[in-house]
Swiss-Prot record:
GO terms for molecular function: catalase activity; heme binding; metal ion binding. There is a cross-link at Y214-M240 (Tryptophyl-tyrosyl-methioninium (Tyr-Met) (with W-91)). Keywords: Heme, Hydrogen peroxide, Iron, Metal-binding, Oxidoreductase, Peroxidase. This is Catalase-peroxidase 2. The lineage of its organism: Bacteria, Pseudomonadati, Pseudomonadota, Betaproteobacteria, Burkholderiales. Heme b binds at H255. Residues 338-362 are annotated as: Disordered. Its cofactor is heme b. Signal peptide: none annotated. It comes from the Bacteria. One of its GO terms (cellular component) is cytosol.
Length: 728
């Protein structure tokens, strides 16, 4: 018998066929458990914001600036300057952001982990992060990898003569890959199963192929057609919240510096970091072409240098773009790229490693899109003729690119946060009045309940306001009271007619209260909306025999329509909200999957989701006042009836004939119809994990626990966006 056969540990714990292998369509609740304290190596009570505030940012930037021009033999710097490499690193960290669900981006240092660390578009960025290790090692916990990656991009630009718009710190690292981000369903790199129809890109994706940040630089699927490439550019950049001017500025600004790498065939390049041998120590793409580095480096397979000043800010990109007519050629690796007709400008570009050699300018297919596309060309020519406008546009677009997923300005830390307030930051006025106290809160609750507005409407309005929050990009939430503004006031899920009546009632209470105060005391509508929900829950709990006080912290303010970018908020309109039993249409994914997706964006745990759904149902807070899932004979009373009845074996459930998402529950003894429910309702009895939690709340001794857990989860959602309160 071999030694291997005798070993009792041929297969390690956690290996073998998984539940997901057996049941690939099983509801994935794991995304509600990611990034727990069990994965976090930092001490309990570690406060990254406080650590960053104690950081000598100027010293870090000084060290980064010095790093730029100290070329390392193990990965030499092009042109003696790492600026281009570090700009690409920061860009590709931030550029994964997409507006559809707010996921991706540079906010948590995900570029360190799979799959991003091994994407084809991120080839050799592992070297960039290794170059940064001595600086990360020096400053330790005072600066996260997430902040360091973005800051390094800024310093790279500044070290090459560009004036950046600013920098805000505060990106806290996570310690494992995100499990919630849908990067596509393709199983091979650079596949594009994500398209349907005539180039219709699947939502929420914002890249044309698996493993790319945005577009294929050779053109759609490698077709070197600048006009068709422009279509892809416009769509993908728009899904990252960039308009045409910002898009042109980013492409031209980024391609003012550095070069691409395609010294030889891709067949020489070894496996990516996640597939490389352990001896590679987390690095990948070892190349057997020549030295495998420097002038022999292979990254994208393209060998392009755009400008005559690749380590200095200039307007040379546009001079070259419009100064030559371009013809198609191929890189040494065989990739499509462009050179001037007749090899014009043959000696205008420096060689990255040999000062005695010169090259001609080269461009990517996607660069020529800025000249071929009529809208892009108009902007490009304006930037060409007005370098100051170009510099300002690039500075602003770069700042937006690298900060778009950070949420409101109140989260930005450090001395370089720009004073200017930008519309994409979803600005909210600072508190300018004395806040209401406990006595005022009690009086206002009484006035709200005295109006006779049903508990269900008070609760659903507060939920509609707060549940827009996305933990992904920290947008949305009750602060700002944007539920009263376009576009949210008109979203179908918010039942505009009912919403308008509730808001009118609350506005009357606010106006009466504010006009009767002295000393500058006021209540905002944003606060009053949340307080109304709290009052409704307290009344519903009291009806159920529970005297509970729902926590409330004032200090929210009301944003104006002018502070609200309608287009930017439109992408946040829910297609589903399982907490309100709302489903806008028919989708490829199940309603319960959309519930979990919504819950993850709300940073909820499995018990919190369970408590909230059960509570919202008995509070009668469904969209359209449907009775699906309202498993109680005493609606608007906060009880555990939902769980008691969804777990009741006296009910037999059957799908309805005309709706796969709707079910009818019949009394097993009498055959009479008792309840109707959706997939979101029945999943709490069907899914083994959710049923286990539902059983806790369905027990006879769990009535008080359920109320307390519901209130705690409710309070969490109401305050998810209160970053300004945390920083007071």
């Amino acid at each position: 018998m071999s030694t291997e056969a005798k070993c009792p540990f041929n297969h390690a714990a956690g290996s073998g066929t998984s539940n997901r292998d057996w049941w690939p369509h099983q509801l994935n609740l794991g995304i509600l458990r990611q990034h727990s304290s069990l994965a976090d190596p930092m001490d309990k009570g570690f406060n990254y914001a406080e650590e960053f505030k104690s950081l000598d940012l100027a010293a870090v930037k000084h060290d980064l600036a010095a790093l730029m021009t100290v070329s390392q033999d193990w990965w030499p710097a092009d042109f003696g300057h790492y600026g281009g490499l570090f700009i690409r690193m920061a860009w590709h960290a931030a550029g994964t952001y997409r507006t559809g669900d707010g996921r991706g981006g540079a906010g948590s240092g995900q570029q360190r982990f799979a799959p991003l660390n091994s994407w084809p578009d991120n080839v050799n960025l592992d070297k960039a992060r290794r170059l940064l290790w001595p600086i990360k090692q020096k400053y330790g916990k005072k600066i996260s990898w997430a902040d360091l990656i973005v800051l390094t991009g800024n310093v790279a630009l500044e070290s090459m003569g560009f004036k950046t718009f600013g920098f805000g710190g505060g990106r806290e690292d996570v310690w494992e890959p995100d499990q919630d981000v849908y990067w596509g369903s393709e199983t091979t790199w650079l596949a594009d199963k994500r398209y349907s129809g005539v180039r219709d890109l699947e939502n929420p994706l914002a890249a044309v192929q698996m493993g790319l940040i945005y577009v294929n630089p050779e053109g759609p699927n490698g077709n070197p057609d600048p006009a068709k490439a422009a279509v892809d550019i416009r769509e993908t950049f728009a899904r990252m919240a960039m308009n045409d001017e910002e898009t042109v500025a980013l492409i031209a600004g980024g391609h003012t510096f550095g070069k691409t790498h395609g010294a030889g065939p891709a067949s020489h390049v070894g496996p990516e970091p996640e597939a490389a041998g352990i001896e590679e120590q987390g690095l990948g793409w070892r190349s057997s072409f020549g030295s495998g580095k420097g002038s022999d480096a292979i990254t994208s397979g393209l060998e392009v240098i755009w400008t005559s000043t690749p380590t200095k800010w200039s307007n040379n990109f546009f001079w070259n773009l419009f100064g030559y007519e371009w013809e198609l050629t191929k890189s040494p690796a065989g990739a499509h790229q462009w050179k001037p007709n007749g090899d014009a400008g043959a000696n205008s570009i420096p060689d990255p490693y040999d000062p005695s050699r010169r090259r001609g300018p080269t461009m990517l297919t996607t660069d020529l899109s800025l000249r071929v596309d009529p809208a892009y060309e108009k902007i490009s020519r304006r930037f060409h003729e007005n370098p100051d406008q170009f510099a300002d546009a690039f500075a602003r677009a770069w700042f937006k690119l690298t900060h778009r997923d950070m949420g409101p300005r109140s989260r930005y830390l450090g001395p370089e946060v720009p004073a200017e307030e930008l519309i994409w930051q979803d600005p909210i006025p600072a508190v300018d009045h004395v806040l209401i106290d406990e006595q005022d809160v009690a009086a206002l609750k009484g006035k709200i309940l005295a109006t006779g507005v049903p508990v269900s409407q008070l609760v659903s309005t507060a939920w509609a306001s707060a549940s827009t929050f996305r933990g992904s990009d920290k947008r949305g939430g009750a602060n700002g009271a944007r539920i009263r503004l376009a576009p949210q006031k008109d979203w179908e899920v918010n039942q505009p007619a009912v919403l308008a009546q509730v808001l009118e009632t609350l506005e009357g209470i606010r106006n009466e209260f504010n006009s009767s105060q002295s000393g500058g005391k006021k209540v905002s509508l944003a606060d009053l909306i949340v307080l109304a929900g709290c009052a409704g829950i307290e009344q519903a709990a009291k009806k159920g025999g529970h005297d509970v006080k729902v926590p409330f912290t004032p200090g929210r303010m009301d944003a104006t329509q002018e502070q609200t970018d309608v287009e930017s908020f439109s992408v946040m309109e829910p297609i589903a909200d399982g907490f309100r039993n709302y489903l806008k249409g028919t989708y490829a994914v199940t309603a319960e999957t959309l519930l979990v997706d919504k819950a993850q964006l709300l940073t909820l745990t499995v018990p919190e989701v369970t408590a909230l759904v059960g509570g919202m149902r008995v509070l009668n807070a469904n969209f359209g006042q449907t009775q699906h899932g309202v498993f109680t004979d005493r609606p608007e009373t906060l009880t555990n009836d939902f769980f008691v009845n969804v777990l009741d074996m006296g009910t037999e459930w059957k799908p309805t004939a005309d709706n796969k998402d709707l079910f009818e529950g019949y009394d097993r003894a009498t055959g009479k119809l008792k309840w109707t429910g959706t997939r979101v309702d029945l999943i709490f009895g069907s899914n083994s994990e959710l049923r286990a939690v539902a059983e806790v709340y369905g027990c006879a001794d769990a009535k008080e626990k359920f109320v307390q857990d519901f209130v705690a989860a409710w309070n969490k959602v109401m305050n998810l966006d209160r970053f300004e309160a945390a920083n007071r």
